[in-house]
A protein has these predicted regions:
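An acidic-aromatic substrate-binding cleft motif
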Residues: 125-156, 176, 183
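Generic recognition of flexible, low-complexity loop/linker segments
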Residues: 63-65, 72-74, 134-136, 167-169, ...
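Short, glycine-/Ser/Thr-/acidic-enriched flexible segments
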Residues: 83, 90-92, 152-153, 186, ...
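Bacterial N-terminal signal peptides
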Residues: 6-12
């Protein structure tokens, strides 16, 4: 266990996790918490947001010992009655018959009475377990829309089309922002150099994008293709560009067999969505050093600004592969995520124990469906209440590329409502090109929606700075800001900080919606003034995003 303790120190986890000595293998602890009458709970995993708040009628099992649900997860639940439950380690959370039951692999499970409201409980938990770093991610994430080449180019990323994609955004009146170049820019997984067959002058491409006003991020993952030069170098020490054998001390990749004397002896072939590959062991200094060295080289050689870190799913670390450090799967996954802390312009999608940190976290891929549009809102609310202040929705219209292929059941109305939902939630991300998939009328709505977003951009930047100090979510539940009004189950609208109420249309074909107006005086986008608390009905023609500014 000395190796595990050393890893915790290396990762600078501080009080986020108990010393591994308190989590002996094979021993479990159980804690059951009875719900109070009318109590509501949030937490455990962002992906479960649509089922939140949990109450006496909930029947669910959330097992974050084996699955992170491809997003943020933590053994933390918080209630609107001022209570929270916390465990440093991963747990299985069963919610049934009006009770929460948490089971850990030995780590203590605490119930804390912190106050009387959701906000009081959250703030107390934040101070005790995931204090804010005081730092923000790159403020460019909040200052303008983001753009990702995934939907348009998928597995065919190339220099010419990337430049054309970026230029099309400017030509159609959208501002430059962060541009993410997605998977297959590289020669291979782990072979982190631009594919020379598709990128004649990658450094020149990045320079052109910079002159256009974009910041450039490259897609990265922790996998190493087992037929790449990188794999041969990491496993044998042979540099494929020469006959020189380099000094390699091992520890780069997860091992396949527990009985192997050294994990490097037989790297595991890990199945993921692009086949089978070796997986970098971030619990070993060599694995971390090699991966970070590749990132630093890309910045130095090509001038890129940061990275879109993908592929950090917990399930890749729960299959019995051998790591250098004898730590739980969550810490193995977290060790990869911690790489993001070295790069302020970085996006991540999976997180355990990284609440309070200056990392932009994206929601898991959403489908091109109305149900998943609604799920974007509930998951953003849930992730914020797990302690992730800087959350980005998935791509506008959804991140499942097959939905945008010719002949697919594309829904232009859904695309517009998705664009509106994202416009005022702090960050928005285009991938499918509006100029390809929409007609002229809907393209105009997109431009107007982005213009609206840009009017609020300075406020979003200031809100991000404030949340870096307080640890609070940028995007907030009504119950968080206005306790005692019965807002716990309102989850189709949200607040940005305490100043902006946003109520997007989330139903297909609907031309009006109900909006819950909390206490205060609110100036609506249509020029009316509404005094809360009250509930109103507002028209939602295709071009309207209902929002209310607090005075």
């Amino acid at each position: 266990m000395k190796v595990a303790a050393s890893l915790l120190a290396t990762l600078a986890l501080g009080p986020l996790f108990a010393d591994p000595e308190t989590c002996p293998h094979g021993e479990t602890r159980t804690r059951t918490v009875r719900m109070l009458p009318g109590e509501h709970w949030w937490g455990a995993a962002t992906w479960w947001g649509e089922r939140m708040p949990f109450d006496a009628q909930t029947d669910a099992v959330i097992d974050i010992r084996t699955d992170g649900y491809a997003n943020q997860y933590q053994s933390f639940l918080v209630s609107d009655r001022g209570r929270y439950v916390w465990c440093d380690a991963q747990t299985t959370v069963t919610i049934r018959d009006g009770a929460l039951t948490l089971v850990s692999d030995g780590a203590p499970i605490a119930l804390v009475e912190a106050g009387a409201t959701l906000r009081e409980a959250f703030r107390a938990a934040s101070r005790a377990h995931f204090p804010p770093s005081g730092q923000t991610p790159d403020l460019a994430f909040f200052a303008a829309p983001q753009y990702c080449t995934w939907i348009e180019l998928t597995y065919g990323q190339n220099e010419r089309d990337i430049l054309a994609y970026a230029q099309s955004m400017l030509d159609n009146g959208l501002p430059p922002g962060i541009l993410m170049i997605d998977d297959t820019w590289q020669a291979g997984y782990g072979d982190w150099r631009f594919d020379p067959g598709r990128f004649a002058d990658p450094k020149g491409m990045v320079e052109k994008l910079h002159r256009m006003g974009f910041k450039v991020l490259l897609w990265m993952c922790p996998f190493v293709g087992m037929d790449t030069p990188a794999y041969r170098l990491l496993t044998t020490g042979i540099n494929p560009k020469s006959v020189v054998r380099e000094k390699m001390t091992g520890g780069f990749l997860l091992g396949d067999e527990a009985e192997a004397e050294n994990p490097m002896d037989r790297p595991a072939a890990v199945r993921w969505w692009n086949g089978k590959s070796a997986l970098v062991d971030f619990t070993h200094p060599n694995g971390r050093r090699w991966f970070k060295g590749e990132c630093d080289r890309l910045i130095a050689d090509y001038g890129v600004d940061g990275f879109k870190m993908d592929g950090g799913h917990l399930v890749f670390y729960t299959r019995g592969y051998r790591a250098f450090a004898d730590v739980p799967s969550g810490l193995q996954a977290q060790a990869y995520g911690r790489v993001c802390l070295d790069y302020p312009t970085c996006e991540f999608r999976n997180a355990f124990g990284l609440a309070g940190q200056p990392i932009v976290e994206r929601l898991n891929d959403k489908g091109h469906t109305w149900a998943d549009l609604r799920k974007c809102v509930t998951d953003l609310l849930a992730g914020g209440l797990l302690g992730y202040s800087f959350l980005c929705p998935d791509m506008i219209g959804g991140g499942q590329w097959v939905a945008f292929l010719p002949g697919s059941a594309f829904d232009a109305e859904l695309f517009i409502r998705s664009c509106q939902m994202q416009a005022l939630c702090g960050m928005m991300q285009f991938s499918a090109s509006p100029w390809r998939v929409l007609d002229a009328t809907d393209q105009r709505i997109v431009r107007e929606t982005v213009a609206l977003r840009q009017r609020f951009a300075p406020r979003f930047v200031e809100l991000a700075k404030a949340c870096a100090q307080t640890g609070e979510p940028m995007l907030r539940h009504l119950e968080y800001e206005f306790p005692g009004h019965g807002y716990a189950t309102v989850k189709d609208q949200f607040l940005m900080g305490d100043f902006l109420l946003v109520a997007p249309q989330l139903e297909k074909g609907a031309t009006s919606r109900t909006v819950v107006i909390p206490p205060g005086t609110w100036h609506a986008d249509d020029g009316t003034v509404v005094v809360g608390p009250t509930t109103i009905s507002v028209p939602t023609p295709r071009a309207r995003l209902p929002h209310f500014l607090r005075r």
